[in-house]
């Protein structure tokens, strides 16, 4: 599915197509692209822009695409310029003309911005989950080392003795503040 270049008479050089393609890196947004498209299809149906039947058909089609990608039945290939083109072509192939109505009232740039926001939100949550797991380990180390001593450091020099619990407690407190950053 070609998105641009309709008025040109010659075939676009493969180097240009490769330069413009983003499928190699934006395919990681497939879940977010589907999530945003399902929400958009719901809105189109609720607003009466498309019929409820078409909205449901689009949502079901997108849900089946997600299931097939995650099960390995459907592979995202580089024959498409980007993840949005892949999704649209696959949806139209599965549900017919109703799939063409998904982009009503939404530009690809809107889609890219939404996909990136959703992806970033999901990745921040994943990182936060990892930090929480790390904090549990640190807390265990603290509890196990209340009476274990080590040299404290100041200006990269050995200083007064501190407990391992106190040392690790400083890191625990730093990680506790992670919510203010996010």
Residue ranges and their predicted role:
Residues 1-179:
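A helix-coil-helix interface module used to build multimeric assemblies
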């Amino acid at each position: 599915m070609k998105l641009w270049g309709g008025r040109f008479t010659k075939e676009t050089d493969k180097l240009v197509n490769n330069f413009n393609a983003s499928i190699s890196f934006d395919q990681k947004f497939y879940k977010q692209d589907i999530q945003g498209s399902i929400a958009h299809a719901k809105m189109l149906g609720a607003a009466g822009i498309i019929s409820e039947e078409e909205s449901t058909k689009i949502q079901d089609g997108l849900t089946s695409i997600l299931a097939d990608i995650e099960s390995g039945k459907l592979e995202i290939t580089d024959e498409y310029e980007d993840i949005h083109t892949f999704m649209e072509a696959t949806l139209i192939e599965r549900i017919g003309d109703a799939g063409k109505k998904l982009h009503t009232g939404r530009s690809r740039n809107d889609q890219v911005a939404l996909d990136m926001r959703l992806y970033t939100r999901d990745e921040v949550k994943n990182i936060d989950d990892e930090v929480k797991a790390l904090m549990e380990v640190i807390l265990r180390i603290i509890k196990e080392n209340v009476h274990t001593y080590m040299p404290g450091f100041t200006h990269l020099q050995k200083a007064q003795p501190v407990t391992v619990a106190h040392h690790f407690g400083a890191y625990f407190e730093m990680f506790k503040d992670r919510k203010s950053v996010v």
